[in-house]
């Protein structure tokens, strides 16, 4: 069937289709469960900017400017208190939703077990899997202690 201008106009004015074209803001998934064994502390929380800003503050600022609507931190339970106290929506001017998920050794897909001598987190893929329940749209993944620059979020 050949589309005519009138048919196209009718097609795009259907109310049920309007819901499908809603702009979805992406989520920024921040991998922050590592301890920084060579560094000796949580370097993702250390201030480096002129007013004590952490590297992650710059990354989230750039993501907000690019239209991101939510940031999810992948952390370990061991660091939960510190992260919840520092990384609040108010820290970012209320311009982005903040959530936390946990990367723990025993959070594995069914049928997998933790080897007795395993003490380190499983890595990037495992960390991303931890956010599956809180991300339901487009997302980008970054490391908390790396600086990417504004262009990375466009």
Predicted regions and their residues:
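Intrinsically disordered, low-complexity segments enriched in small/polar residues
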Residues: 16-18, 50, 92, 121, ...
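Conserved beta-loop-beta/alpha segment of the NTase-like Rossmann-fold superfamily
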Residues: 95-98, 102-154
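Basic polycationic patches enriched in arginine
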Residues: 6-7
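N-terminal glycine-rich phosphate-binding loop and ensuing alpha1 helix
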Residues: 21-89, 96-98, 137
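Short, Lys/Arg-enriched N-terminal segments with co-localized hydrophobic residues
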Residues: 11-22
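Residue-level recognition of conserved structural "scaffold" positions that shape functional pockets
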Residues: 16, 41-43, 130, 151
